[in-house]
Curated annotation (Swiss-Prot):
The gene is pghm-1. GO terms for biological process: peptide metabolic process. This is Probable peptidylglycine alpha-hydroxylating monooxygenase 1. Binds 2 copper ions per subunit. PANTHER family: PEPTIDYL-GLYCINE ALPHA-AMIDATING MONOOXYGENASE. Cu cation A binds at H66, H67, H142. Belongs to the copper type II ascorbate-dependent monooxygenase family. It is found in: Secreted.
Length: 324
């Protein structure tokens, strides 16, 4: 069972105050000793002063944390200092368990495999605190391996109280599904943009576990003859550092009526079927799009499909001219 070394209330208060007044602040695990394949969350309540997050740096290594996710929440999933937020893995009966967010979750940032720091483009920021829907930051750390010593994995966040003219958000395209034994399979998802926004994608990130070979994201526009026109957002080997990298076309825009899609190529050389899930023995198919808007960002930033074998672009989404 993980053991927790709690910070004092004075230390927490000092940290919360520094978040409002400093240009760089940290959110860290308070000395946890995790078991293998554990997902742990800790949260920070934001002040009434609006802030704009403009940069992120992981304070860990891939040998310690498998990945780190930073969520913006209206309310955290728990009032505990640290809690088990691995909703898809086996629960620990002796540890408080809850989702990452109690309401209105929004993925802000993701890190894995020794990815370098990320600085957002000039004049772009994630709006948090104040009158925004994000009243708390929640950091989720996936520890793939158990640890013997207390761990303080965290994130260094660059922020400013100066309003940024372009608001940032992160969209996640993700699938479920099953990867059959001794087979290479394609996992696909596609969603129509239904909200009245103009998205300017500037960075993308891919994530799978060890069976991932390639992950790509595409913008699809349909013409009056119902012919689909595909434009690459980004394509990457998920075994490389899982950093946010620039999109292929920085002038690209995604608008109401367009379709965003993602595809993961996974290769299974094992004599067992592999399900999509949270543990080291499962797989994942994730494609993140970081974008900015001149006005409000989208309310729904998740695109999900059940994945293979139940979902295919040509069959369920009725897409044509699909790239290889």
């Amino acid at each position: 069972m993980p053991r927790f070394y709690l910070l004092s209330s004075c230390a927490l208060l000092a940290f919360a105050t520094s978040f409002c007044n400093a240009e760089k602040s940290q959110i860290r695990m308070p000395g946890v000793v995790p078991e293998a394949d554990s997902y742990l969350c800790t949260s920070l309540e934001l002040s009434d002063q609006e802030n704009y997050l403009t940069g992120f740096k992981a304070l860990t290594t891939k040998g310690t944390a498998h990945h780190i996710l930073l969520f913006g929440c209206e309310e955290p999933g728990s009032d505990e200092l640290v809690w088990d937020c691995g909703e898809m893995n086996k629960p620990d009966d002796e540890m408080p368990r809850a989702p990452t967010c109690g309401s209105k979750p929004a993925i802000l940032y993701a890190w894995a495999l020794d990815a370098p720091p990320l600085e957002l483009p000039q004049d772009v920021g994630f709006r948090v605190g104040g009158d925004s829907n994000i009243r708390h930051l929640v950091m989720q750390v996936h520890y793939m391996h158990s640890k013997q010593e207390p761990d303080e994995t965290g994130l260094e966040i660059t922020h400013t109280e100066e309003p940024q003219p372009k608001l940032a958000a992160t969209m996640l395209l993700v699938t479920g599904g099953t990867l059959p034994r001794n087979k290479t399979e394609s996992f696909e998802t596609a969603c129509m943009i239904e909200e009245d926004v103009v998205m300017h994608p500037f960075a993308y990130r891919t994530h799978t576990h060890r069976h991932g070979k390639e992950v790509s994201g595409w913008l699809v526009k349909e013409d009056q003859k119902h012919e689909d026109h595909w434009k690459l957002i980004g394509r990457r080997d998920p075994q490389l550092a899982q950093m946010f990298v620039p999109v292929e076309d920085q002038a690209m825009t995604i608008q109401q009526g367009d379709m965003v899609t993602a595809r993961c190529i996974l290769q299974n050389n094992e004599n067992r079927d592999i399900s999509m899930g949270a543990t080291e023995e499962d797989e994942m198919c994730n494609f993140y799009i970081m974008y900015w808007t001149d006005g409000e960002v989208m309310q729904d930033n998740t695109c999900y499909s059940p994945g293979a074998p139940d979902y295919k672009w040509a069959r369920e989404a009725d897409l044509n001219h699909i790239p290889k």
